Amino acid sequence: MELRNLFPVAGALGAAFFLIADAGAAPSLPASLNGFVHYSTSNYGGKISDKYVQKTSIQALQSGKTLPNGTAVVGIEYRDQNGKRGPVLRYIIMEKVRNGGKDYPASVRNGDWEFASFTPARALITNDPVTRCLACHKSQAQSDYLFGLNEMKS
């Protein structure tokens, strides 16, 4: 599948991706998925979620390294319409940042990962957007807080 078929508005997002330099700042939604690779699709809670990560991060994993700081994982959640992607519900980003996650309570902290969530119009959701994400990903400490780490490696 081509990205444009999965993410028809990718071109409208622009062409650049800016990494977050300081921990504690909400990650930015990439302006484009250029340089990202689709690595997983999951269905949960009436949603279909496609996940993307930078090709350079996958290459690091495949060469036996851990995911480097600056790694961004983008999730695009669609309404599940009988097994087909409906409208985009939200965009989610996890970004691994040196000393990241320090502003989250220890009970939900996910290592150095920062999280953010965005509306279909790409506006940052600020009223408790990621508590559910943090709680769920906390269970994946053994895989750098990621679901699908093995898919990234293959």
Per-range role (PLM):
Residues 1-10, 91:
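Bacterial N-terminal signal peptides that target proteins for export
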Residues 10-18:
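Bacterial N-terminal signal peptides
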Residues 21-25:
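Boundary at the C-terminal end of the N-terminal hydrophobic targeting segment
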Residues 26-47, 63-154:
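Sequence context surrounding c-type heme c attachment/ligation sites in exported
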Residues 47-58:
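Short, structured beta-strand/loop micro-motifs enriched in basic residues and often containing a Trp
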